[in-house]
């Protein structure tokens, strides 16, 4: 079955102290529901970003912050496995309501590992 990434977006000035107990409870309830349905493969919040870029001289430069400058950043991700894109969107819709943030859904295309010799 296909896997999907659900990425939740937060404003770049997000203050975690604004999360109330009701919202945290709804997020935990949704995670329990996903686990019970057998669709959740991973879920977690994300810390600060660091960007690495190759330089013309072959070196790699590391900078603080996300690669793209934007007013929003990815605050958390969930990986789910569903039979159809519509089913993934239905779970994402529940995520929008529980987390109170916009989300993006993308199918994950797995690259096969190297053949064992």
List the model feature ranges, each with a label:
Residues 1-117:
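Conserved, structured core segments of small domains
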């Amino acid at each position: 079955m296909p896997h999907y990434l659900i990425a939740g977006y937060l404003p770049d000035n997000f203050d975690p102290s604004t999360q109330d107990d009701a919202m945290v409870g709804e997020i935990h309830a949704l995670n329990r529901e996903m686990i019970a349905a057998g669709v959740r493969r991973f879920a977690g919040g994300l810390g600060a970003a660091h960007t690495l870029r190759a330089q013309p001289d072959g070196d790699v430069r590391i900078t603080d912050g996300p690669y793209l400058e934007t007013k929003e950043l990815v605050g958390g991700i969930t990986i789910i496995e569903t039979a159809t894109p519509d089913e993934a969107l239905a779970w994402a819709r529940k995520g929008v309501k529980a987390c109170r943030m916009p989300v993006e859904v993308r199918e994950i295309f797995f690259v096969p590992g190297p053949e064992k010799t």
